[in-house]
Regions:
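Internal alpha-helical scaffold of NAD(P)-dependent oxidoreductase catalytic cores
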Residues: 83-91, 106-142, 152-191, 234, ...
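NAD(P)-dependent Rossmann-like dehydrogenase/reductase catalytic/cofactor-binding core
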Residues: 176-179, 183-245
Length: 245
């Protein structure tokens, strides 16, 4: 929402939310009116940001209010476009953004059920960051590595802060240093392989190599794979649970 507001001040938003606390939070942050019931939607884009478990109830209650010219945009993990098509005949686009789009510099993987750029929505999305279309069968792994991706890096950062604190730095200093480290990383990332960048940073028998050797001896690759695999399997499981409802 913040990214879209930054992108075009002339966009019109109609927000619907059941939870009173969330409604108040939106009103305070964006100064928007928020309704708890959907009006008849004749045109435009309906962005679904609800919990997957609430999807059936949402469409059972509201599908007759969503007219055929409305583009349905979903960001729900594990929910396939084919499942939504059971309720409505509308064009559907599925996205897997992450929080970086609020600053209009994100990356948005998408898949859609139609060919053209309906309502110029892809053009609008490109203002939030780069966009790339994928086969929907890849969305489980995309959800795991990109949708959940920021959490992996921030969890690692949190553990580094804890370790630095145990080794003598104050928590505030540790947080400051890691924050500066994270801000510097984009300048290192380009067309080069990550492994090549690591090689450029480390030196023989140096501190970086010592740390990497420790990670390898503790099966860091297995730890990372298990985490990504667990997230991927959870996305698959969510999809199965929804399809069986």
């Amino acid at each position: 929402l913040k990214g879209l507001i930054n992108l075009d001040k002339n966009l019109t938003f109609h927000l619907y939310e059941k939870e009173p606390k969330v409604m108040e939070s939106i009103k305070e942050e964006f100064n928007f009116d928020v309704k708890n019931e959907i009006d008849v939607i004749e045109s435009g884009i309906l962005l679904l940001c609800i919990k997957p478990k609430d999807l059936n109830k949402f469409f059972d209650t509201n599908k007759d209010k969503i007219l055929k010219d409305v583009l349905i945009c979903t960001v729900l993990a594990g929910v396939e476009t084919a499942y939504i098509s059971k309720f409505v005949e509308n064009k559907i686009i599925r996205l897997m953004p992450n929080l970086s789009i609020k600053n209009n510099n994100g990356f948005i993987p998408y898949t859609k059920t139609y060919q053209e750029d309906y309502l110029s929505f892809l053009e609008l999305l490109s203002g939030l960051g780069s966009i790339t279309e994928y086969e929907e069968e890849l969305f489980h792994i995309i959800t795991a590595i990109y949708g959940s991706g920021p959490a992996w890096y921030l969890e690692l950062s949190s553990r580094i802060v804890e370790s630095a604190t145990k080794l003598g730095l104050s928590k505030s200093e540790s947080n400051k240093i890691i924050n500066e480290l994270l801000k510097s990383l984009p300048s290192l990332v380009g067309g080069d392989e990550f492994s090549n960048i690591v090689e450029k940073i480390k030196s023989p028998k140096g501190t970086t190599e010592a740390g990497i050797n420790s990670l390898n001896s503790d099966s860091f690759d297995k730890i990372v794979f298990n985490a990504i695999n667990a997230a991927t399997e959870r996305s698959i499981q969510i999809s199965k649970e929804i399809n069986n409802e």
